[in-house]
Amino acid sequence: MKKGFFITIEGPDGAGKTSLLDNLMPALRDIFGDNLIETREPGGVRISEAIRKIVLGLKYPEMNRRTEALLFAAARAQHMVEKIEPALADGKIVLSDRFVDSSIAYQGGGRELGIEAVGEINNFATNGLQPNLTLLLDLPSEVGIARIMKHRSDEVNRLDKDRLVFHKKVRQTYLQLAKDQPNRIKVLDATQSPEKIAINALQLIQESLKGWI
């Protein structure tokens, strides 16, 4: 049986991941049909969705940064065994809204826990699984925060409320990851129109899948 293909969408808050997925999924479904599995993090399965409510909700402002990192990793571990690993083993294309790179950028960089420390936690949680392709939406932190406050006033989560300096560290860490892993992580200019971003993303996905299909 053909081995599955794992794609992740990453980016700082306000970069437009939701818009990209809304524009991208219809085209991908037309191409791949039932072979495409869409999911998200934290979440994707029941236990992980429950953790999502705790770690992203506004109910626990006292949450320690290490607690935060471990909760994200715990949600990811359950997501892996219940959804991602079985789908990949079945030869599916898995498209996830966020994965390990988010933890490295947000907790490793933004929370200053360190890239190596957060990487080790998540290596244990995922048994070392890495995506085949990661699309990183990038834009200035000031622009991203402005978008959040303008368009997502009813859905702002705990991480959205962090200071600008936090979000700048997140972006810097993402860009460092892309610099270190250029074959896997492809950077998309998130200041472009949603339609243009979706076209570029679809092209990158199709190019990456040429040897797989």
Curated annotation (Swiss-Prot):
The keyword Transferase applies. GO terms for biological process: dTDP biosynthetic process; dTTP biosynthetic process; dUDP biosynthetic process. It catalyses: dTMP + ATP = dTDP + ADP. GO terms for molecular function: ATP binding; dTMP kinase activity. Keywords: ATP-binding, Kinase, Nucleotide biosynthesis, Nucleotide-binding, Transferase. This is Thymidylate kinase. Phosphorylation of dTMP to form dTDP in both de novo and salvage pathways of dTTP synthesis. ATP binds at residues 11-18. It comes from Oenococcus oeni (strain ATCC BAA-331 / PSU-1). Belongs to the thymidylate kinase family. One of its GO terms (cellular component) is cytosol. The lineage of its organism: Bacteria, Bacillati, Bacillota, Bacilli, Lactobacillales. NCBIfam families: DTMP_kinase. InterPro entries: P-loop_NTPase (IPR027417), Thymidylate_kin-like_dom (IPR039430), Thymidylate_kin_CS (IPR018095), Thymidylate_kinase (IPR018094). Its EC number is 2.7.4.9.
